[in-house]
Every structure is written in structure tokens, then in C-alpha cells.
Amino acid sequence: MGAGILPTTIRNGKIWFLFGKENKFEKSAPGFSDFGGGKDNNETPLETAIREGGEELTGFLGTDEQLKKQLKAHGTYNIDFAENKYRTHIFPMKYDPYLEKYYNNNQKFIQKRLDPNIIKTSKIFEKAEIKWICIDDLPKMKPKFRHFFVNIVDQIIQQKTEIAAFIAKSNGTRKSRE
């Protein structure tokens, strides 16, 4: 089963998700999605999600061990696509208004200077951009998502009440630990 991570926060009373956009060389399924991919060997879906998330976010959310610790500390809200095909692990994350800017500037800088063949073949350049997207904007943004991820977007919209409760509960837990 393939899997990915989807950082989520509550900001100004609304749910926000951090999505990644594929680089310009992805022609078969361009657009936004979570940070994920296929499993390696005998990985669990969570192990796959952590490895893929670390690769696609190029360490911006920490090492694999730091991501694992964060996901295990607060748990994940899971959305499955086509039973046993793909799982998105939604997890709470503190909103960082500069994360988009730093990641996107870093990617632009590096990708402008590297040989395009490196960008095409390296796992760490799959996402050219990240973006915080409010749940209220998901319906109109559906055409901008990767075609296979639209089903997960639909499930996120349908389950927004449960996701909000999960994130709010986790945020309360995090605040008590700080």
C-alpha cells in the first residue's frame, strides 16, 4: 500500500492543509497532492508515508525520526483510497507562516541551478512548491490536484468535521506539552 503525509492545522478557526505540487517534469499526473508514494519492500503504510514525506519535503519538517516521533505523539487521521491501494496520514502541525516561502524559494534556487536531468530523476525534487490550502477552497481547487488524488480530496471535504475534531484534540494535547 502506498502512503503519504498531509500536515494540517487550524488557523483562524479554519482547517488548513499543506499540499505539495509536482515539478514541471511530471506529465502523467501534474498538480497538488499529499507527500507520498509507493512502499519499499516490507514497509508499513506509516513507514512509507514517513520516508516519502521526508524525501518530498527535503527535510523541511525534520528527519525521518523526527517525523515519526511527531506522527506517533499525536496520531494520524487516515483516509484510504481504494481499499489497500493508498493511505493519506493527516497529522497536526503548528502553522508556520514562513514555511511556504522558505521551501518554495529554496526549490526555485536549487532547481534553477541544477541540471534538469537531476531534477527529473531525483526523489527529493518531486515537489516544486508547497502551499497551505484552506478546506473551504478545496472544492474550487479540485482541478489543480493530481487526478488520482481527487478522491482523497472528496473524502477530506466529506470528513471535515471529524478531521477538525481530530486536529483540535491534538492541538490541545500539544499545547499541554509545550
Place the predicted regions along the sequence by residue.
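N-terminal strand-loop-strand
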Residues: M1-F35, H89
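Short, charged/polar surface micro-motifs in flexible loops or helix N-caps
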Residues: N12-G13, F25-E26, D40, M93-L99
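Structured loops at beta-to-helix junctions and adjacent beta-edge loops in soluble globular domains
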Residues: T8, F91-K94, I135-D136
